[in-house]
Amino acid sequence: MASENLNDKISVFKKLKAKSDNKICFDCNAKNPTWASVTYGIFLCIDCSAVHRSLGVHISFVRSTNLDSWSSEQLKMMIYGGNNRAQVFFKQYGWSDGGKTEAKYTSRAADLYKQILAKEVAKSKAEEELDLPPSPPDSTQVPNGLSSIKTSEALKESNTLKQQEKPDVVPVSPRISRSVKKPLGAKKTGKTGGLGARKLTTKSSGTLYDQKPEESVIIQATSPVSAKSARSSFSSRFDYADNVQNREDYMSPQVVSHVAPPKSSGFFEEELEMNGGRFQKKPITSSSKLQIQETDEARKKFTNAKSISSAQYFGNDNNSADLEAKSSLKKFSGSSAISSADLFGDGDGDFPLDLTAGDLLNRLSLQAQQDISSLKNMAEETKKKLGSVASSLWV
């Protein structure tokens, strides 16, 4: 594809540069221009191409005829343009060869000329897509000699043939729309009230009324044996029905409405366990009966007791331990304070040798406090006794 464009570029520029008008620069008349403005289809020298490039590509798009690659549309712009055609067009709008370049190519005339070239190139491209020969510009505006009058006349004849053929093709669409609308109009009936009802033409036979209506099929519940046989014949997607009997027993209303009340008074005496989606009552064993008798005995035994210990309840009462505890408590019945050493039998009065001075002082101070408190208690008791004696004497 690139080689074809290159060959087209070389052949096109060879033909265009063979003309005398294209051998000089469009702006400064310098010889052998190697640059061109694609926007206006004119040939320029390297100095004028720099001026056009400074204007911006939106005003003038400049490319080299030797170094740059050209597309087919760009080559058509050069074919439909040319220095001679552009010079004639600009002179019609009062622009001569001299003058400011920027003002010239930003004028209204330059904009119109650019639009004319773009339209001609687009038209030729559309004709090529339709496999028609491209239509060159008018003979009055084409001084380049690339097209002839015969081709334009042939093109006009082809256009007239197209216009003659068009009226025959246009009425096809309304005919189709009319044929489509006919069924819609046929549905409208004024006599039937707009509901579209139609009278029956065929009478129904009288035997239809004598026929007995079909009885509804009653689906009977299958037994477990028949369910198993049917399940064996079904495919694997019916394997979920393994517990059919259990599900029927669970869904039956007898399980909910006829629950027998518990015979014993205990709440946790009857154990329930889940088996296949239903609760089953566990039979009462001999051990549970023994527990019931024991609880009755305990109730009779401790009816009037205010407190019950675990040792008394389970029969593990140790009388010797109770006696020792009671005897140890009797020793401290009159004392106001009891130390752990005195309670557990370690209060022999001898201090261990490994005590520090601080611990020794603490113990001595604690013993002194206990002695002082005991003396205070004795003094209070004697005071009370003396007061009672004195009151009895005065009376």
UniProtKB/Swiss-Prot annotation:
PROSITE patterns: ARFGAP. One of its GO terms (cellular component) is Golgi apparatus. It is found in: Golgi apparatus. Residues 125-199 are annotated as: Disordered. InterPro entries: ARFGAP/RecO, ArfGAP_dom, ArfGAP_dom_sf. A zinc finger (C4-type) spans 25-48. Residues 140-162 have a biased composition (Polar residues). Keywords: Acetylation, Coiled coil, Golgi apparatus, GTPase activation, Metal-binding, Phosphoprotein, Zinc, Zinc-finger. Residues 361-389 form a coiled coil. The modification N-acetylalanine is found at A2. Residues 10-128 form the Arf-GAP domain. Expressed specifically in roots, pollen grains and pollen tubes. The modification Phosphoserine is found at S307. GO terms for biological process: embryo development ending in seed dormancy; pollen development. Disruption phenotype: Plants are arrested during endosperm development and have altered root hair development and pollen tube elongation. Its main location: Golgi. GTPase-activating protein (GAP) for ADP ribosylation factor (ARF). Activates ARF1 and ARF2. Required for female gametophyte development. Involved in root hair and pollen tube growth. PANTHER family: ADP-RIBOSYLATION FACTOR GTPASE ACTIVATING PROTEIN 3, ISOFORM H-RELATED, ADP-RIBOSYLATION FACTOR GTPASE-ACTIVATING PROTEIN AGD10. This is ADP-ribosylation factor GTPase-activating protein AGD10. It comes from Arabidopsis thaliana. The gene is AGD10.
